[in-house]
């Protein structure tokens, strides 16, 4: 139950998704989870294309870290509308799979019924807000970084990388050679001063580091090793989840997340996110289930990056091993 204190008469959030509203939130656990007593929160919208749909996705932030519905303590949580998902289960099934594969920091899902200013908005999926923090990507925000490769290209700190010339470019136009890369978390304007740097200086350090990883992926021979740059098990698990769910969003690319514990570490793929356009849904119900995840006609940078990764024999070998193990032990579940 969410009641806006500044607009108690509203039937829906209006304006920008980033507009924040004070609200009172409470939650009935219905015997399955602990009730959440009334408390003040900041309530706002979220999402990209889904924000413009009839059923709005939401986000709320509490004053202190709280364990909600059995999830780890955190301040911020998301309410996924699943408006284009007639099953209301695409995200839930995909994230279950990520947890089954023991992908670090995989999200959890709890179905909830949402009441907004007393109006029933229907079924939502309550989940962790992805970001650096104890409830999501639990790494040191002063040492690590969470990146997102996404054609929306709408974060404050971002750069585009040309996969063929191996250089950064000025714009993130979505084409076969360009990969739009963004800093998802933390807020560099808050972290950099504590490290004795400006936000731009800290951004440049990480931009160069991420670019070095991309260059390695694009230039290393298929028989070479990428273990110096990426955690290949995380890559394989990432592809298994997206392949089984037929999630073509990663090709565009959309919601393609990677993180690194520190500059001395390696990049890990995940947490996986956003399966609205998955399980053969591609703008219409009944799209062919055998549509290739990667083919020779891809016109987006995501295609090019994924093809380079999957051409690596080390990754392909582990992919086959983990796939066989999943078919034997996991698929029957």
Please describe what each predicted stretch is.
Residues 1-333:
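Phosphate/dinucleotide-binding and metal-coordinating scaffold of catalytic cores
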């Amino acid at each position: 139950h969410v009641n806006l204190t500044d607009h108690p008469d509203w039937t829906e959030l209006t304006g920008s998704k980033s507009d924040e509203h004070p609200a009172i939130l409470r939650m009935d656990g219905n015997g399955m989870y602990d009730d959440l007593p009334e408390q003040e929160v900041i309530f706002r919208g979220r999402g990209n294309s889904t924000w413009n749909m009839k059923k709005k996705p939401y986000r709320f932030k509490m004053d202190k870290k709280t364990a909600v519905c059995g999830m780890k303590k955190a301040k911020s949580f998301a309410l996924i509308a699943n408006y284009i998902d007639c099953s209301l289960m695409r995200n839930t099934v995909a994230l279950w799979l990520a947890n089954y594969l023991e992908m670090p920091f995989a999200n959890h899902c709890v179905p909830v019924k949402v009441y907004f200013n007393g109006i029933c908005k229907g079924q939502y999926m309550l989940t962790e807000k992805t970001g650096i923090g104890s409830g999501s990507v639990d790494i040191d925000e002063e040492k690590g970084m969470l990146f997102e490769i996404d054609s929306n290209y709408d974060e404050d700190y971002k750069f585009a990388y040309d996969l063929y010339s191996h250089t950064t470019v000025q714009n993130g136009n979505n084409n076969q050679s360009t990969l739009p890369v963004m800093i998802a978390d933390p807020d560099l304007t808050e972290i950099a001063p504590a490290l004795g740097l400006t936000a731009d200086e800290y951004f440049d350090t990480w931009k160069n580091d991420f670019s070095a990883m991309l260059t390695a992926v694009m230039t290393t021979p298929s028989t070479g090793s990428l273990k110096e740059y990426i955690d290949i098990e995380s890559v394989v698990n990432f592809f298994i989840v997206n392949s089984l769910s037929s999630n073509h969003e990663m090709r565009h690319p959309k919601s393609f997340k990677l993180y690194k514990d520190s500059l001395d570490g390696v990049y890990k793929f995940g947490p996986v996110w956003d399966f609205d356009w998955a399980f053969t849904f591609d703008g219409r119900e009944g799209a062919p289930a055998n549509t290739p995840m990667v083919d020779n006609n891809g016109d987006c940078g995501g295609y090019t990056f994924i093809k380079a990764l999957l051409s690596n024999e080390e990754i392909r070998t582990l992919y086959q091993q983990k796939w066989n193990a999943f078919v034997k032990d996991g698929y029957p579940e």
